[in-house]
Amino acid sequence: MLLINCDLGERGIAHQTDDKLVKYIDIANIACGGHAGSKDSANYYVDLCIKNNIKITAHISYPDKENFGRKVIEIEDEILLRSFDEQFALFDGIHAVKPHGALYNELNKNAILAKLFVGWCISSNINELVTSPFGVLAQYAKSQGITILRESFVERGYMLDDNANPMIIPRGMPNAEIDSVDKAMKQFEQLNNGFIDVGGTKVAFISDTICIHSDSSIALELAQALRFL
C-alpha cells in the first residue's frame, strides 16, 4: 500500500486536527518558517512524530508567508538559498525534504531552479526528496544520487500537462480539490493500482506515497479511512 504523507505544523503548536492526523500517517512534512510554522511548532511536531514513529521531511518553501508559499516569487538565488538554510536549520538529523506549494510546482518545470535546489540538497546532506515523478526535479535529483519518493495526491484533481503527464489542477480552477471522502478513496484505488483516470483517459502513474493536505476539509476522515483499509 502507498505510504500516507501529510503536511503538518502549518497552523501552530498543538493544532487539534494536526495532532490527530499523526496517528494515521507514515510521513510528516513539517513546516519550517518559509510559508508557515516556526521553530516552536517545528520542534513540537518533530517530537510528536518521533514518539509516533513517523518519518519526517522538512517542508521547504519560498519565503512567503503572506501568500502561504503558493505564489512564485522573484528572488535572488543567494537570498533563496539562505532562506532554505534558515528553514532547514530548524531540524537536526533530518535528511529528507518535500518542497511546498509554488516551489514544488516550479521545481518540476524549471530546470535551472531544480539544479540550484539539488545542489543545495547535496550540500545540506539531504538524500531523499518527496516530489512528482514526472518533473525535472525528480529526473535531475536521481541523476545526482538522491532518492525520490514518487508522490501523488489523493484529494486533488488531475489534468494532463503539455507532455501528457498527470499534474494537479491549479487551485482556484474547477475540480482542483476533492471534497468527498468517497471520491478521494476511488482516486486512491486507482493510484494504488498504478494509474489515474484523467477526463476519461487512463494514464500510468506509479507512486510511492500519497499526500493529504492537513487543511483539506476531509483530511482527518480520509486519513482514517485509508489507514483502516
What do these predicted regions represent?
Residues 19-23, 42-57, 92:
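Acidic (Asp/Glu)-rich catalytic clusters
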Residues 167-229:
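C-terminal alpha-helical cap/extension of soluble enzyme domains
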Residues 64-99:
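Glycine/small-residue-rich loop that forms an oxyanion/phosphate-binding "nest" at active or ligand-binding sites
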Residues 135-192:
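Active-site rim beta-loop-alpha module in soluble metabolic enzymes
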